[in-house]
UniProtKB/Swiss-Prot annotation:
Coiled coil: none annotated. It comes from Myxococcus xanthus (strain DK1622). It is found in: Cytoplasm. Homodimer. This is Serine hydroxymethyltransferase. Its EC number is 2.1.2.1. Pfam families: SHMT. The keyword Cytoplasm applies. InterPro entries: PyrdxlP-dep_Trfase, PyrdxlP-dep_Trfase_major, PyrdxlP-dep_Trfase_small, Ser_HO-MeTrfase, Ser_HO-MeTrfase-like, Ser_HO-MeTrfase_PLP_BS, SHMT-like_dom. (6S)-5,6,7,8-tetrahydrofolate binds at L120, G124, H125, L126. GO terms for cellular component: cytosol.
């Protein structure tokens, strides 16, 4: 039969892409804070026959027949997410974090309503009201930022703007903020002005699940997340809420902004949630934070400045201005050395978003490989050496060899290269 031929037989070009990407992940150091390595079990679920099944609607209330089996998968995902985060209601159908946010916003606001959120240049996310994003086009957006001296959230500004603009929703969450988020303080401000509180915990969901970071679930009205990043599941979205918001959220996700859910991805989410309920996952999350602190110290020893002076979570922002480098150049230099990071705006950055003055560095992926504090000292040193050798391709090639040697001691998907 045609459909039982292997990928290499059907499409050798894509088979080569898979092999080369596996090799890149295997031999390099993945330090992009939003990336992680899923388990073979998650990959098995996502690459399964569930990709064949349409299932518009929700368990027990589908618009298609033959959904009795996939209903089991979705109900498992919902139950496990409730258990993991202590949420009243859960929607696991959002295809991405952006769609989770869109559904949540539409459940809370009408077009033209006001939201108060962290500015993108201060570490926020584009779905939190960036002018070029749907959120900035549909809603009136007021942004809060950071203090110049501490480079942490300026709560005096948050409170002042909330009182002035009376937002319908206060959005809490970030894509590049290395410090603990004070959810209780945001709740206090939201209550004072009659605003709903939405937390986007996409970056810290794994830390929250393990109790390593305070949970927003008891204090927020709605919590959104991705299911990858620190949660280490497949790429997708998740919405947690108090029960009164559940019906509105569900109707906005489907049929509001999506059609059929991705049942193979929902099954992968269920697997990831089960993994996240284990004691091993909690230990893993603790190690992510320990590794981040160790890596931050190593980078500082290498002469690099970190915004806010360090990190409380899984990521850090490196200010490259003292090195006379841009984030764009640093990303390219480190890539030559087999170290993957992403250029990132830093607080009060004078550069443009495609240039930036910094890079974002995170530890979830290398912690999944089994690396610990001792390896973080090595990684920090190698980053420093690579940036100091920005114009020396021979030196960068030597560092890449050291990176490969280090990585080979912590195999990931090596069996897939055989």
């Amino acid at each position: 039969m045609e459909n039982i031929r292997t990928l290499a037989e059907v499409d050798p070009e894509i088979a080569r892409v898979l092999r080369e990407e596996t090799q890149r992940q295997e031999e390099g150091l993945e330090l992009i804070a939003s990336e992680n390595f899923v388990s073979p079990a998650v990959m098995e679920a996502v690459g399964s026959v569930l990709t064949n099944k349409y299932a518009e609607g929700y368990p027990g209330k589908r618009y298609y027949g033959g959904c009795e089996v996939v209903d089991v998968a979705e109900n498992l995902a919902i139950a496990r997410a409730k258990d993991l985060f202590g949420a009243d209601a859960v929607n696991v159908q959002a295809h991405s974090g952006s769609q989770a946010n869109m559904g949540a916003f539409m459940a809370l606001m009408k077009p033209g309503d006001t939201m108060l959120s962290l500015d993108l240049n201060s570490g926020g996310h584009l779905t939190h009201g960036a002018t070029f994003n749907f959120s900035g086009k549909l809603y009136k957006v007021v942004h809060y930022g950071l203090t110049r001296d501490t480079e942490t959230i300026d709560f005096a500004q948050v409170e002042s703007l909330a009182k002035e603009h009376k937002p319908k929703v206060i959005v809490v969450g970030a894509s590049a903020y290395p410090r603990t988020l004070d959810f209780a303080k945001f709740r206090e401000i939201a209550d004072a002005v009659g605003a709903a509180m939405l937390v986007d915990m996409a970056h810290i969901a794994g830390l929250v699940a393990a109790g390593v970071h305070p949970s927003p679930v008891p204090v927020a009205d709605i919590v959104t997340s991705t299911t990858h990043k620190t949660l280490r599941g497949p790429r997708g979205g998740l919405v947690l809420s108090r029960e009164p918001y559940a019906k509105a959220i569900n109707s906005q996700i489907f049929p509001g902004i999506q059609g059929g859910p991705l049942m193979h991805v929902i099954a992968g989410k269920a697997v990831a949630f089960k993994e996240a309920l284990s004691p091993e996952f909690k230990a893993y999350q603790r190690q992510i934070v320990a590794n981040a602190k160790a890596l931050a110290e190593a980078l500082q020893r290498a002469g690099l400045r970190l915004t806010s002076g360090g990190t409380d979570n899984h990521l850090m922002l490196v200010d490259l201005r003292p090195k006379k480098l841009t984030g764009k150049v640093a990303e390219e230099v480190l890539d030559k050395a087999g170290i993957t990071v992403n250029k990132n705006m830093i607080p009060f950055d004078p550069e443009k978003p495609m240039t930036t003055s910094g890079v974002r560095v995170g530890t979830p992926a290398i912690t999944t490989r089994g690396m610990r504090e001792a390896e973080m000292a090595v990684v920090g040193r190698l980053i420093g050496e690579a940036l100091d050798a920005a114009q020396d391709d021979a030196a960068l090639a030597r560092i890449k060899g050291q990176v490969k040697e280090l990585s080979q001691g912590f195999p990931l998907y090596a069996s897939r290269l055989k």
